[in-house]
Structure formats: structure tokens, C-alpha cells
């Protein structure tokens, strides 16, 4: 937002410098990005007086002028402008001056006549587009004075970065409120003095709004007898200073009010509006409108359109239509002021790539209460600058009047959030200076009515933040956080985020690196993983086409991380992410459901290349071991791993269950999918349901068990099994025998002979007695029971 200090001082009596203003606003959260001096390039230009003008003896179109610039003898200047005449006050660039376009003025001879400077046009000075002749100045301008002083131009402009939640600051008025707040200054609004004449015009146009949510307010005023011409210099130069191109007095007023009050306006040629009505409604699919830039736009049902009785006349909140624009022939004007739904305007502007100063403000929300004041101020200016007659009455429709939210404010809550003591008087005065109405009938729980321009006031924390902002965030001393847990909460289940944090520490301690990805992904990312279309939640106003839906799995983000790391030359990757996934759920109050997930991705070299090791890549055993370690960390025993029939993007895929409840899956990313992410080796992924794991963890009871005193005895057994037999089936069978001395079984080796559809599986069994040392004979007897049972019950041989 470009803020002219001269313009600002019409609202608040601020006498400081631009730097002082920027420093204070920055501390209030409105960062000063740059101080611009828009007319620095014409600082050397002086006011001259044309003493005489003679025709050039060698060129009919040139004049030889003697120009007094207040430096003694008049200067000889050759000028080619047809409108130069003796007695004029004119802008003069002296020898040595660098013009805005980069040209340096030098002594020269033009057709034999010496010239010691240049008499300038508006375009040469960057003060307009007029280049038909020189710029003629008022006779009151002092000879030899600097042009910028005599024109009283806006010399300093602050470029203020406005955060998306502070739409109220996208105007001189909005920033003036902040300056008044920061420096304790009074705020003065421009006075209204409406001179209305003629018959009532409130019924000149009927305003129809079928859907109030799309347009809460639409009204306008009628002006007749307007003369469309160039705006006065003060308005043109002020608009130029803040980056707006002057067009004509009518259009310039609408832009002036937009920058001054933050309310976009639009002026129609009333004679070109047909049918005596205006309708604001959704466009029909495929409907067309030629906008002011001359481009024909094809509209969708998501666009908001303004129509007269016969045709579209404007793309609401974005740009007006070419058919009803103000031209030199216009004399009757309909001045529109309205409020539109921000999301609708944002979507249309993004889709069409048509961002304007108006749409930028409508997207963020405008002040519905100030809308009428802005329209009346614009009408007053148009009447004064064009000679128009303002008709009494307003064409008005407000189907959804503004309802000011009433929020609670508890000083004790503010002190708890900020960690500081808050003075009651300071809090009340701050809220009132912000424009709030404070009902302090309950001293501990105030009722605060938010002002219409602060659409970001939605909850108590917003008011507390404002109090802290005005007090000064830099005055709040940092303190170490205190974590207090009452004794009556001892043993209670930990919070979801505490559970997440413990898992993150576990994963980091295991050597995994945390990934944090956007919740937004592209439809094509989910399609690529063969994920179901049903249940996806689209984003209404996506930042990009690649982020137009909420993720239904964490895998897309991790696979993108994989692609990036491979591109950076990382040979081995160990990633994890703890986050939510989202699915549509018609039974939910919000029509959506969030689920917590822990995903782990391993890829490439098993060991760090800096350590001596046998070269090997991560495989199923690695990802399974990590999952088993996680379950052990959560004190969850008895996990089963069962081959899944199918999975959208994992093959093979194994279901992981604990106590009969599925807690996730592990498997290899399908090669064709991994290849699309530039993976040249197997990528293994685990997807665990944290909601289920947390429930199981909270229900788990840890019992004390003394450490074993007597040594274990181990026996290995190798079975030849068909390739279709799962290892889990063998393990489950051995453990299912419930041998009293058997305390553990693990797979230690797999051998697959060439040309045979079988594999040799070697298991290591651990035996132990709690109160004595085992003898070999009794251990061998237990092993024989296992061997006999395996041969009898399973298709294996020892």
C-alpha cells in the first residue's frame, strides 16, 4: 500500500518524518518496505517566465524564446511546442538537468540558434500523457522557484506491506487510524457537503439481488449534466504519486476514493443502462462480457455478474463492462458502491488472471458501513469537478445488513496468554481507540463490539493480540515456559500433541529425518498413486493448480521429498512425517474427517557412506524393523504382519495389526510409481494410523517383570517351505504351541535355491527357565516338538 504523507496529514496532524512513521508502523505489524520520492527526478525543474517569443528564422515550427528563470539575464531557449507564448509561466529544465527519461540537457544549437535549456511538456516531466504542447503553469507561480514546490506535490510516499488479515489498512483512512493509534493523534474525516437538486432518483434503477450472500449491499447515486474532462492538477498528481494513472475526472474520482477510503466504486454511463434495473447474480455458464480492457471474457457459474435489464454490464468486484463505460460524450452518471463476497471475487480474479486495485480489496473484504460515506464523498467530488447536478435519493438494496460481532475480553485471559500484567484502564482505552465499544458491566468479562472495518476481529485472542500490539511486542520480556501438571492429572492419558512429540523424538533418535509437507496436493499427485477419487476435498481458492485438494495420504509429499533428494545426490534416505490426512465424510458436522498418520520412507543405501560397511540397500527387513521398534517403544506387543491382497501404491504390501486391530501397512512402492519419482532402487514405506496406536498405547498397562537371572539357550531350525507360504504363518504356528520354555522366535536367514519354487527359512528359537539353568536334553526335546508339529501341520520339511 502506497501512503502519501501529504495525503495522510489531511486525516491526522502527523508532523514527523517518513522514517519515524515507518519505524512505528513496523512495530505495529505494518512493515515499511521503502520510502519513495515519486517526483525526485523533476526536483531540478524550475519555473520560468517567457519574456518574448520569436519565430525561428530557419524553421517555421520552432520558436526562439527568452525565458526568465530568476538567474539574471533571460535564457535563450529554442522550443518546438505550438502553444508557447510570451507571458506564460512554464517549467524549465536547465543545462545539466537529467530528465525522468534519462536525457541530459546540454547547451545546443538548433538550426543555428543557441539553446540553453528546455521548456517541458507534462509527459517529459512524468506528470501526465499530454505531449501536444508545453505545460503552462498558473501565473501565481514564483519565477525561479522549484516546480515541485509550486505544484505542492506529494514528496514522500511510504510503501507499507499489508498482511492479508489487515484489509482495513488498504487505504489512507485505514493507515491514518493506525497512525492516530500509534501517536495518540485525533482522526479527522473529510467533511461532506452534498448539494442535491432536482427530483428524487431513488427509483431511477431497481436493484435486484437474488442471493444476499453474494452481494450484501449494492447502492448508487445519479448525477446529471456532468462534463467529462481532465481532472485538476492536484488530483492527477496525487494519483500519480501513489501509482494510479489519471484518466478523466469521473474515473479519477472513483480511483481517488478507492485509495483514500478503501471502497472500490464504479461509474456507469446512465444513458447506456437499459431496462431501468440492475441485477447482481451469478453468471450463466459460457456467458460473455467485454471488460474495460477490451477483452471478451467467457464466464462460469462461479463468477458474479452485474446486469442491466438487457445485458451484462460488469464483472462484479473485478472490472466494469466496456458497453457502459464513461466516455467524453457521457453526461448522466450512475455511481455504484457495493459489497461483494470476498471468496467469489478472489476465485474470479484468479481464474481470469485479472487482478485490479478493486478486486484486491474486495478479495479481502471491505467496510460495509463506510460504503455509503465513500459513495457520497465521491458524488460530492464528481459534482464539484464536472459541474454535475447531484440528484437526491439513493438507489439502494441491502439484503444482508452488517451485524457487528460481540466478543468477550477477559483481562485475566490476556495476562495468561501474554505472560504479563495488563492495566485495566490501558486495555479499555486501547480497545476504544481501535473503534470498539466496550461493555464493562462485568469487570472480569467485558463484552466488546467490534468496529465494521476490523473484519479480522473474530475471537477473544484477536482482541488480546491488539492490546499487546499497541502496548508493544518489543516490551514483552521473554521468559522460559512453565509446564505445570496438577497431581490429580497424574496418570491421565497424554494429549495428542504430546504423543506426537514423543514419536518425533523417537524417530529422530532412530536416525530418521522429519519431513514437513503442505496439506495441499494436486489431484494428479493422488491420481498417480491410484488413490480413490471419492473422499477428496477440493480447495475453493487454491494457490496453484498443483495444490488444489487436501491430501488423503502422506505418501505424495514424502515421494516428492524423495525426488528432490535424489536430484541432490543423496544415496540413502530415511524420512518420517507426522501429520493429518483429510477425507470427506457426510456424517460429520464439518462434512470432513481428519486422521493422524505416521509415515516412514526408507530408500537406497542402508548405511552411511562415511562408515566402513558391506554395501547393501534397504529392504523389507529394514522397514519392518523400524515399525517393530516403534511398537515396542509404545509398549505394544503381539504385532502380526499379514500379506495384503492389494494396495493402491504398495506391492508387496503387508497389513500390520496389534491385538486384532489394524494399525497400518508396510510395503514397497510399486516400481512404476517409484520410477516416476526418479527412484532407481526400491523405496519402502510404512503408513501407521496414529489414532489407533494412541488408543492402544493409552490402554496398555506396563507390568514389572524382573530381569532374567539364568542364561538362555538357543536352537536353530531350518524348514524348506513353498514360496507361497508366509513367514508369519510359520512364526505364528511356533508361538501358538505355547511351549513353557520358549521365550522368543526370529527369522535369521532366507535361502532361495535356483529353479525351485521353495525357500529355506532358518528360525532361531530362544529357551529360558526363570528359576534354573536349562539342560540340553530338555531344550532338544522342545525343539523336536516344534519340528514334529511343523511337518505335521504345515507344508514344510525340516
Curated annotation (Swiss-Prot):
Coiled coil: none annotated. It is an enzyme of class 6 (ligase). Mg(2+) binds at residues 456, 462, 465-466. It catalyses: tRNA(Phe) + L-phenylalanine + ATP = L-phenylalanyl-tRNA(Phe) + AMP + diphosphate + H(+). Residues 39-148 form the tRNA-binding domain. Gene3D superfamilies: 3.30.56.10, Bira Bifunctional Protein, Domain 2 (3.30.930.10), Ferrodoxin-fold anticodon-binding domain (3.30.70.380), Nucleic acid-binding proteins (2.40.50.140), Phenylalanyl-trna Synthetase, Chain B, domain 3 (3.50.40.10). SMART domains: B3_4, B5, FDX-ACB. Its main location: cytoplasm. GO terms for biological process: phenylalanyl-tRNA aminoacylation. HAMAP family: Phe_tRNA_synth_beta1. This is Phenylalanine--tRNA ligase beta subunit. It comes from Nitratidesulfovibrio vulgaris (strain ATCC 29579 / DSM 644 / CCUG 34227 / NCIMB 8303 / VKM B-1760 / Hildenborough) (Desulfovibrio vulgaris). The gene is pheT.
